[in-house]
Amino acid sequence: AMGLAMEHTGAAALVAQKTVAFVNYLVPGVHKAIAMLAGVYLITALFTEILSNNAVAALMAPIAIGVAAELGANPRPFVIAVMFAASAAFSTPIGYQTNTYVYGIGGYKFGDFLKIGIPLNILCFVVAMLVIPEVWPL
C-alpha cells in the first residue's frame, strides 16, 4: 500500500528526480547509472536494518523504477538491487523477524549482530554491484 501511495501521489517520482539531480552534480556522466544503482542498494540496505524488509522493498521499488526512468536506464537492475538489499538485513535484530526471534531466545546482544552483520552486508554489496550489472545490464 505504501509503495502504491508513493507512486499515485507522485512522491516516488519526486524522490527519484531529486536523487538523480544530486548524483548528476556529484558523479561524472559515464558512472551515473552504476553510482545510482549503488545508491539505491545502500539506501535500501540501511532502511532494511531499521524497518521490515517487506516494507522497505515496497517503499523503495517505485523509487528505484523512477530513478531508472530519470536515467533512461533499464529498471530491472534497480529493482533487483532493491530486492537483494532488502533481503540483506544482517546488522540488527530489527529488520527481519528471524533475527528478532534469535535475538531474544539466543541471548545475543545488539553488538553481536553488528560484528557479524556489517562485514556480511559489505560482502553482499560488493557481490551485488559486480553481479547485477553483468546479469541485468543497465
What are these language model-derived features?
Residues A1-L138:
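Transmembrane helical cores of multi-pass ion-transport proteins
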